[in-house]
Design a protein with these regions (language model features):
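Active-site-proximal N-terminal segment of extracellular/periplasmic enzymes that hydrolyze or transfer
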Residues: 22-23, 27-72, 81, 263, ...
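Active-site regions of oxyanion-processing enzymes, predominantly non-cytosolic
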Residues: 33-40, 144-167, 175-182, 218, ...
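Histidine-centered active-site microenvironments of extracellular/periplasmic hydrolases
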Residues: 258-264, 330-394
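Catalytic-site neighborhoods of secreted/periplasmic enzymes
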Residues: 95-218
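C-terminal cap/loop subdomain of S1 sulfatases and analogous C-terminal strand-loop tails that border
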Residues: 152, 160-169, 177-178, 349-355, ...
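Long, internal low-complexity/basic segments
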Residues: 8, 27-28, 35-38, 45, ...
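Short, structured active-site-proximal loop/turn typified by the sulfatase FGly-forming signature C/S-X-P-X-R
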Residues: 51-88, 94-95, 99-100, 131-134, ...
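N-terminal export signals
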Residues: 6-25
Length: 555
């Protein structure tokens, strides 16, 4: 078995054909001007954890490592929902889900809204009006009936599954078809195999799979992942020398479950070297019961060795995406466009990847699902490359960043995010946010959840179960829920026929004075944010007004 050193050597060799070459040294970053407006290249692989690209992390990402040394890494970037559609819509609009209207999967009958609200504007529209050439390649997943072209992009390559507009089948015909498929295909499939999750009547799933060598492309990557990137490289070649600034976005399935990866990338890792996440043994006893059900109904079927193998495949899939990213960077360099191109590497959301014993994404509030990788390189616009910035960044910040870089006045658009350009210039922006917020209304099954997180604490309002409160300094892996109620105490009071009232403040569950103050402060922030961003999560009726403090606490 190879050693860790040979793994790194193998990864470096794998990336050699798409090496990120050093760029010439730059002086003081230039301000965006119409005469030298930057190009914009965005690579968004799906479902990638933030931690996998951190320097020193055992997941192999040699291209991102070199790229980060030439740019700025934002370690505290968060999406507004750990779900493809709302986060991708926020990226394209600079708005939160409550403002653009996309809360869950737009391609299901349970979509809260199948498309962004009418009149929603997308940042490519502004770039096009400013003279930019625009192109989109790969996964979209922003609306059921809108395509990248509708949002201002010119489509280069879109997977077959998304090459449709106004072709969605809903209502009775769709339901009849779904039932017929379920009856025919989702049968009990016998004993569980290694790496499988047994789901009676639903059909088993293979969490991970090692695929044969892929000979259809020089990287040995999955063809469905390679094609959007290949289309992007061809577009980069055509854009060179066009005389116009351009923006190109390339997106694919990234590290999305399930973790099926060609053997070439799997063999870069030693299964014996894979460690379980530090919070893997979390029994979730003080967490919402849906979290417990997700773990114990499905994921607890996997042995520790299977979990390690699944993590290995998740990392291997991320390494494959890193090789594809290197192909884009290499093409950008070879065509002479790297010097004045803003390149962004990010994801739409994360993946639990074994954290707390969970996989994929969804309603669990843990940071592994919300914290996304974010690295930006712009040789002409970055001071002191190689930095890490730990300020809170939101997915909504990218759209205004691109527009400011293009020289478009902020008075021309209305967005909720803030430009990241000051951070790139090495400045400390005035009044930068000291908290981040989420807006989750569920996935295919509905759950109302809101998160407010500061550097010190994280509060999770769960309209469907107990709330959560974590001390981010003392408990960085979110193991102990400080808001978990002492149910036995309340039960005893009920059995004794006594009321729970304890004076002026009867917020439940009772907490220590310090934590009670923390909770009140964070809920004040939550309601203030909800009001500012038109988030209609309050209803005063007694059966649904479950937050310990209602919106009146902010007044």
């Amino acid at each position: 078995m190879a050693t860790r050193r040979s793994f790194l050597a193998s990864a470096a060799a794998l990336a050699a054909s798409n090496l990120v070459k050093p760029l010439k040294a730059q002086g003081r970053p230039s301000s965006p001007g119409k005469e030298a407006r930057p190009n914009i290249l965005i690579f968004m692989p799906d479902q990638t954890q933030a931690q996998v690209v951190l320097l020193g992390y055992p997941c192999l990402t040699p291209n991102v490592d070199r790229f980060a040394a030439q740019g700025v890494m934002f370690t505290h970037a968060f999406c507004p929902a750990p779900h493809c559609c709302p986060s991708r819509a926020s990226f394209q609009t600079g708005l939160y889900p409550s403002e653009h209207g996309v809360f869950n999967n737009v391609d299901t009958d349970t979509a809260i809204h199948a498309n962004p609200y009418p009149g929603t504007r997308f940042f490519p529209e502004y770039l096009r009006r400013a003279g930019y050439q625009l192109d989109y390649s790969g996964k979209w997943h922003v609306g059921r009936d809108i395509t990248p072209q509708d949002a201002g992009w010119t489509n280069s390559y879109t997977p077959v599954a998304e090459k449709r507009k106004h072709t969605y089948v809903s209502g009775k015909n769709r339901q009849d078809s779904a039932w017929a498929t379920a009856r025919a295909e989702l049968r009990e499939t016998g004993p569980r195999k290694l790496g499988e999750v047994f789901r009676p009547g639903w059909g088993n799933i293979e969490l991970y799979k090692t695929l044969p060598a892929q000979e259809s492309n020089p990287l040995g990557a999955l063809e469905r992942e390679y094609k959007p990137v290949l289309a992007g490289t061809e577009k980069l070649k055509r854009l060179a020398g066009s005389g116009h600034p351009w923006a190109l976005m390339v997106s694919n399935n990234g590290s999305h479950d399930f973790y099926d990866v060609p053997k070439r990338f799997v063999e870069l890792y030693d299964p014996k070297s894979i460690e379980l996440p530090p919070n893997f043994r979390d029994a979730l006893e003080d967490k919402p019961r849906i979290y417990q059900r997700m773990r114990y109904q499905y994921w607890a079927q996997l042995s520790d060795d299977e979990v390690r193998t699944a993590i290995l495949h998740y990392w291997a899939k991320t390494t494959m995406q890193d090789a594809l990213f290197g192909l884009l960077l290499d093409t950008l360099e070879k065509t002479g466009q790297a010097d004045n191109t803003i390149v962004v590497y990010l994801s739409d959301h994360g993946d639990y990847a074994g954290a707390h014993g969970l996989w994929a994404k969804g309603v669990p509030s843990f940071c592994e699902g919300y914290n996304i990788p974010c690295v930006i390189r712009w040789p002409r616009g970055i001071a002191h490359p190689g930095r890490q910035v730990d300020a809170f960044v939101s997915t909504t910040d990218f759209a205004p960043t691109f527009l400011e870089a293009a020289g478009i006045p902020s008075s021309d658009y209305k967005m909720s995010g803030a430009s990241l350009l000051p951070w790139l210039r090495g400045e400390m922006p005035a009044n930068w946010r000291d908290a981040v917020f989420s807006q989750l209304n569920g996935v295919e099954l509905y759950y109302t959840q809101r998160i407010v997180m500061t550097k010190d604490y994280k509060y999770v309002y769960n309209g469907f179960d107990y709330d959560e409160l974590y001390d981010r300094n003392q408990d960085p892996h979110e193991m102990r829920n400080l808001a978990f109620p002492d149910v036995q105490r309340s039960r005893t009071l009920v059995e004794q026929g006594r009321g729970r009232g304890n004076g002026d403040d009867v917020a439940w569950p009772p907490l220590s004075p310090h934590l009670a103050d923390v909770r009140r402060d964070l809920l004040q922030r939550m309601w203030k944010f909800a009001q500012e961003h038109k988030d209609q999560i309050f209803n005063p009726y007694i059966t649904v007004s479950m937050a310990p403090y209602g919106p009146g606490v902010e007044l």
